[in-house]
Amino acid sequence: MFTELRSKLSPPRARAGAVRPGFGERPDVDASAHFSFCQTLLEHTVSAENIPCHLPRTPGTSLTWHDSRSQRASSSRPIKLLQQPGSEIPQARLYSDHYGLYHTSPSLGGLTRPVVLWSQQDVCKWLKKHCPHNYLVYVEAFSQHAITGRALLRLNADKLQRMGLTQEAQRQEVLQQVLHLQVREEGRSLKLLSQASFGNMS
């Protein structure tokens, strides 16, 4: 009795290999749709990778950090400092005037460097030209103290005495020539400044 009642109440078992209606076909449909989607995506990716990509690149440009840094270094432009209006001096004119007009060295007929840039050898040549009588005495004293052009313009009687020129006549001779040199350098400096100002106005 109980066996018959249980057989009536319990639902019939599905046979092996049987497929439920409306349920067994959906996994196959989902799997096929997923497979076709993946295949389409893969084909699109491969086709995109196979497309040759040529970026327009002008000469001198670069796409890497190192190349761009070298490019900036090679194409760097001089930085112009801020100046007041009307106070700018053309650099080309200033350099040409400084090294073409502002020259007083005795070695090449007054066409080399300014006195402040004279070496010890230039000072010795100047002494030989302007103080020929006691030239050897002056050259020995100036060489021992390494007198250059800048130091030559700053000489006075006390410095010459400490350098070993004990005679007053010798000191006066050197100081007189140094004074002439200072006046000549001052005049050349004023000429350079006036030419630079005139070039700025024009």
Curated annotation (Swiss-Prot):
Ranges for region Disordered: 1-22
Parts forming coiled coils: none
Pfam family name, one: SAM_2
Chain's gene name: Samd10
CDD domains associated with the record: SAM_aveugle-like
Occurrences of domain SAM (ranges): 118-184
InterPro entries for this protein: Aveugle-like_SAM_dom (IPR039144), SAM (IPR001660), SAM/pointed_sf (IPR013761), SAM_domain-containing_protein (IPR052268)
PANTHER family per the UniProt record, alphabetical: STERILE ALPHA MOTIF DOMAIN CONTAINING PROTEIN 10, STERILE ALPHA MOTIF DOMAIN-CONTAINING PROTEIN 10
SMART domains: SAM (SM00454)
Protein name: Sterile alpha motif domain-containing protein 10
